[in-house]
């Protein structure tokens, strides 16, 4: 497909959880990775590492751990009962069902990309004590979003997921990610992103209007 207008690509980059088995080219993945690598990071530290999984056996391994993680997570979710209307309830059920589908079929998605970040001291200290300068993953998630928007521009669907962190130890070991000499983890998983051609269509997802969550100059000073 032709390259999309930037705003259209951004506003139609929604979580895709159902994919066809159509192969995804290495060239397209490399394009998305180049876009990811151009994302800004604090102090230009560029902490992320990417693990691209296309091997069917390794995808199956990831699929098993993802499914096990989602099983635990799903059981912990209470069934909401305070929906404002049936449309909101139906939307919640669709998202839940699509997430379940992804958990059961992750191994069938052509490409799985894991975004890793090092476990390192992050912050600064002066004579007054520690300074809160934000979290290291704030320098990783812009790369994830760049990747997803680039994929959208190529007609590929993605979803930013994190539930795999429940079984991060097993997944990192399966991928051969090095640990520290004492056996403690050297990296953690910031995100697992499936990549493939979507079942269905892209579109603008329902969201709160920006005006509802925007305050100008002072809190609650909103514009209609």
Label for each model-derived stretch:
Residues 5-22:
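Generic N-terminal amphipathic, Lys/Arg-enriched alpha-helix
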Residues 12, 181-224:
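C-terminal helix-cap and adjacent tail motif
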Residues 18-19, 49, 157-162:
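Short catalytic-loop micro-motif centered on adjacent basic/acidic residues
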Residues 32-37, 113-174:
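Small-aliphatic-rich amphipathic alpha-helix that forms the alpha element of a beta-alpha
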Residues 39-44:
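Glycine-rich phosphate/pyrophosphate-binding beta-alpha loops
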Residues 47-48, 109-112, 189-190:
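Short, surface-exposed beta-edge/turn micro-motifs
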Residues 52-140:
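Glycine/small-residue-rich phosphate/adenosyl-binding loop
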Residues 68-69, 175-179:
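Short, hinge-like loop/turn segments at secondary-structure boundaries
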